[in-house]
Amino acid sequence: MGDQALSFLKDFLAGGIAAAVSKTAVAPIERVKLLLQVQHASKQISAEKQYKGIIDCVVRIPKEQGFLSFWRGNLANVIRYFPTQALNFAFKDKYKQIFLGGVDRHKQFWRYFAGNLASGGAAGATSLCFVYPLDFARTRLAADVGKGSSQREFNGLGDCLTKIFKSDGLKGLYQGFSVSVQGIIIYRAAYFGVYDTAKGMLPDPKNVHIIVSWMIAQSVTAVAGLVSYPFDTVRRRMMMQSGRKGADIMYTGTVDCWRKIAKDEGRKAFFKGAWSNVLRGMGGAFVLVLYDEIKKYV
C-alpha cells in the first residue's frame, strides 16, 4: 500500500471512530434539536401537542415515548456519520493539496484562509452526495414520535428507506438535497477553514495543547452551526415532505419553504433548537480534537 493510500485510510478511520463515539454521546440533544425544528411540519404532532422549547421536549420525550427513545435514529446517524465525517476529513486533505499547494500561510494569509474555506466546503459537499439517504432516514426516524411499533411511522432504518423509495422513488430520499449542499458548504467552510487557519497561525501547530485545540474547535463549531442553521431547518422541513401526497404537501419547493416559514412562523422559526445545537456542537468540537489525537497513534 502506497504512502498516500495509507494516509487516506488513517484519515478515514480516525475521523469515523471519533465521530461515532461523539454522536452517540450527544444523541439525546440531537433528537431534541430535530423535533423542535420539524414539529411544525409533522403529521404526528398536532398544534396543541407541539413542544414549547428544549426543557419541555427533554421532560416529555421519556414520559411519552420512553427513555431509550432519546436515541431514536442514532443507529442511522452513526452509520451515516462514520462515512460522512471520515470522508470529510479524508477529502479535506486532498482538497487542501489542490487549493493550498505552494501557499505560504504566513506570507499569503488571505489566500491561505480562502484555500482552507474552499477545501472544507468542497469536502462537505462531496461526502454529502454519497450519504444523503442515510441523513434523510436519520431525520425521519428521530422525528417519529409514536410510542409503540403500532403508532410509529417507521419500524427502523430499512423500513424507512424502503417505504419512502416505494412511495416517491430515489427523489424522495434526496428531498431537500439542494439546500443541504448550500448549508453544508457554509458550515464546513467555517468548520474546517477557520479551525485549520487558527491552528496554522499558532507557533507550533503540531504540538498544540488539547485544551487549546478544544477551545478553538468549540468556538468554530458554535459560530459555523449558527450561521448555517436556517439552511438546516429548511432542509429538515423538506425531508418531512417525502411520502406525502396532494393536500398533505406543505411546501411546493425549497423557496416556498423559506417563504412560508418566514411568513407563518416568523424569522425566529429558522433558529428553533439552535441552542441545543450549540450544546451538540461540544460533540462536534470533541470530534475535531479527538481526530487529531487519534491520528498521532494510527
Swiss-Prot record:
User: At which residues is Phosphoserine found?
Assistant: 7, 149-150
Keyword annotations of the record: Acetylation, Antiport, Membrane, Methylation, Mitochondrion, Mitochondrion inner membrane, Phosphoprotein, Repeat, S-nitrosylation, Transmembrane, Transmembrane helix, Transport
Important for transport activity: region residues: 235-240
Q: Which residues lie on this side of the membrane: Mitochondrial intermembrane?
A: 1-7, 100-109, 200-210, 292-298
Q: Which InterPro entries match?
A: ADT_euk_type, Mit_carrier, Mitochondrial_sb/sol_carrier, Mt_carrier_dom_sf
A single GO BP term for this record reads:
negative regulation of cardiac muscle cell apoptotic process
Post-translational modification, as annotated? Under cell death induction, transglutaminated by TGM2. Transglutamination leads to formation of covalent cross-links between a glutamine and the epsilon-amino group of a lysine residue, forming polymers.
**Residue numbers of N6-succinyllysine PTMs:** 147, 245, 272
Map motif Nucleotide carrier signature motif onto the chain.
Answer: 235-240
Please tell me where ADP binds in this chain: 80, 92, 235
Q: Which reaction does it catalyse?
A: ADP(in) + ATP(out) = ADP(out) + ATP(in); H(+)(in) = H(+)(out)
Lineage, top-rank taxon, reads Eukaryota
Subcellular localization, per the record?
Answer: Mitochondrion inner membrane; Membrane
Instruction: State the signal peptide span.
Output: none
GO CC annotation: membrane; membrane raft; mitochondrial inner membrane; mitochondrial membrane; mitochondrial outer membrane; mitochondrial permeability transition pore complex
TM ranges: 8-37, 75-99, 110-130, 179-199, 211-231, 274-291
Residues modified to N-acetylglycine: 2
Question: Mitochondrial matrix topology: which positions?
Answer: 38-74, 131-178, 232-273
Q: What is known of its domains?
A: The transmembrane helices are not perpendicular to the plane of the membrane, but cross the membrane at an angle. Odd-numbered transmembrane helices exhibit a sharp kink, due to the presence of a conserved proline residue.
Q: In UniProt terms, what function does this protein have?
A: ADP:ATP antiporter that mediates import of ADP into the mitochondrial matrix for ATP synthesis, and export of ATP out to fuel the cell. Cycles between the cytoplasmic-open state (c-state) and the matrix-open state (m-state): operates by the alternating access mechanism with a single substrate-binding site intermittently exposed to either the cytosolic (c-state) or matrix (m-state) side of the inner mitochondrial membrane. In addition to its ADP:ATP antiporter activity, also involved in mitochondrial uncoupling and mitochondrial permeability transition pore (mPTP) activity.
Q: Which family does it belong to?
A: Belongs to the mitochondrial carrier (TC 2.A.29) family.
Report the protein name in the record.
ADP/ATP translocase 1
